[in-house]
Amino acid sequence: MADPESPWSQIGRKIKLEGLSDVASISTKLQNTLIQYHSIKEDEWRVAKKVKDVTVWRKPSEEFNGYLYKAQGVMDDVVNNVIDHIRPGPWRLDWDRLMTSLDVLEHFEENCCVMRYTTAGQLLNIISPREFVDFSYTVGYEEGLLSCGVSVEWSETRPEFVRGYNHPCGWFCVPLKDSPSQSLLTGYIQTDLRGMIPQSAVDTAMASTLANFYSDLRKGLRKA
């Protein structure tokens, strides 16, 4: 859970009470937080999982008692298509095997919304289905795009799901300099799954989930 003094802990209430004027400042802070993650030196990361086309690293999170994960791999598609498949929209459920539902609860502008999504159980249901309510923001970054998000406090709950919490997370996607039809996709994820789960199960699930994310996304892009 977020530190009570963390600026992220009251984001949901701020969005509801202060409206769009505050959403702009939240968007900027979220973007800057992800850019800070993107500038973390290589020697601070430890490899958590490495497969043919994806590497996943981790380091202790500064937001909660868990890990910040970094994942990176090359996608055989242009930036806009890659990000359009990741951010809230019609394509995400077509390819993401972990996600079971996605609804936009509030739409602020074209690139900014609050969404609710659910995920399937993992590790033979040691990790039961989860629900997340996230503020999502997509913005230009260098020659590409950044799609980022953070969980918000939302009063409506559903008893069949455990409410998880995403600390600031996001996906940087930029064209390869020598092959602009391909994109380098780099993700930063720090999810508090909450509930009574062994930490070893969380660590196994997170690294595998990120590797599978790239595999599933590649398949989805080929079908598009």
Swiss-Prot record:
Keywords for this protein: Lipid transport, Lipid-binding, Transport
Reaction catalysed by this enzyme: cholesterol(in) = cholesterol(out)
GO molecular function: cholesterol binding
Keyword Chaperone among record annotations: no
Tissue expression summary: Expressed in most tissues, with highest levels in liver and in kidney.
GO cellular component, one term: endoplasmic reticulum
Keyword Metal-binding: no
Effect on the protein upon substituting K41E: In strain: C57BL/6
InterPro entries: StarD4 (IPR042555), START-like_dom_sf (IPR023393), START_lipid-bd_dom (IPR002913)
Induction entry: Down-regulated by dietary cholesterol.
Function: Involved in the intracellular transport of cholesterol. Binds cholesterol or other sterols.
Name of this protein: StAR-related lipid transfer protein 4
Organism (species): Mus musculus (Mouse)
